[in-house]
Amino acid sequence: RGVKARLLGAELAAAPAARGGGQVIPAARRALYAAVLTATPRLLEPVYSVEISSPADCVASIYTLLGRRRGSVLADAPRPGTPVFRVRAALPVLDSFGFETDLRVATQGQAFCLSTFDAWAVVPGDPLDRAIVLRPLEPAPPAALARELMVKTRRRKGMADDVSLASFFDDPALAELAAADVGLR
């Protein structure tokens, strides 16, 4: 979002038939991919705004349930003239699957929720950090969540676990970046 690239110069073929987008677009694409990967990219995830209505004695269970799912309470207040307590929270969509069922179980069916899309938020962690070791059948720690999401998505699509910058640079440019210690992944 909000990225702008300016092409300052290009040497095109002399023959008019050989000139065109096919000469510039692949080179520009490789340069932009490499720029994004060397700029420590981050993943974004959708976040729901959740409104939960329940009796006041169920609020502690709601807080516990939201805390286990990376949710955060934005506001809570009783509804005037009723025994109902209203809690507004932000909950990542990734952690919202099964939330309503868990909410009903935790409150013996006394609470119900309404979820709507609210915003995009940065997923914690660096998706390109190779130092993070992911173990099968174990939840990733919060600092490794972005890495886990990227690796699982790449595996599902049949791609290698890691992105290699070498495919976006020519050998001389790659050697120059390595000498500058850019941290090639």
Predicted features along the sequence, with ranges:
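Accessory interaction regions appended to the cores of large information-processing enzymes
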Residues: 1-185
